[in-house]
């Protein structure tokens, strides 16, 4: 009797996995394509970079930031200085102080007329993040998900049934 119940539960679990794997992604065919804006050499940041790069043809352009605080301050300063566009790509965005602070700065930039594009990995993005939902409502902001799960509410099932597809990284 116990082995029959275990078999029935296993069969029910297998059925749920198969049915969950049959779910398709949402239709995005009507969504407007988004492209980067032309080179921003005419902006204050662009001119500053050009001055720093003068005579540095072999420089990589990377400047390591050794602490999280340094990285956050640098991002916030860049957002404040942006004149035309901001393109962000994140694997993880949380509703913590850092996420809310960055969202507030991005909203301020969008209010100034700066186009803000945010690309998030769906695996590292919380469900129903109010700050991201609020940002996405702004006409100058686009929030997009990379590799969206077919069912965001049942992430566990999507990871089990579509692991090879949803486990890719940006």
Regions picked out by a protein language model, each given a short descriptive name:
Residues 1-11:
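Bacterial N-terminal signal peptides that target proteins for export
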Residues 2-3, 17, 69, 83:
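A general, composition-driven signal for non-globular sequence regions
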Residues 9-19:
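Gram-negative bacterial Sec-dependent N-terminal signal peptides
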Residues 17-39:
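Bacterial Sec signal peptide processing site at the extreme N-terminus
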Residues 22, 39-46, 50-82, 92-170:
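HKD-type phospholipase D/PLD-like phosphodiesterase module
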Residues 86:
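Phosphate/adenylate-binding glycine loop and adjacent helical scaffold
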């Amino acid at each position: 009797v116990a082995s029959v119940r275990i078999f029935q539960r296993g069969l029910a679990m297998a059925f749920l996995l198969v049915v969950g794997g049959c779910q398709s992604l949402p239709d995005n065919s009507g969504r407007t394509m988004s492209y980067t804006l032309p080179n921003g050499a005419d902006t204050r940041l662009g001119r500053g970079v050009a001055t720093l790069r003068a005579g540095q043809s072999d420089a990589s352009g990377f400047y390591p930031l050794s602490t999280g605080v340094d990285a956050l301050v640098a991002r916030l300063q860049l957002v404040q200085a942006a004149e035309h566009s901001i393109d962000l790509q994140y694997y993880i965005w949380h509703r913590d102080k850092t996420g809310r602070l960055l969202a507030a700065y991005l909203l301020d930039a969008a209010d100034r007329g700066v186009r803000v594009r945010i690309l998030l990995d769906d695996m590292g993005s919380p469900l129903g993040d109010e700050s991201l939902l609020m940002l996405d409502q702004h006409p100058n902001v686009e929030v997009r998900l990379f590799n969206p799960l077919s069912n965001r509410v049942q992430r566990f099932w999507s990871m089990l049934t579509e692991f090879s597809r949803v486990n890719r990284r940006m």
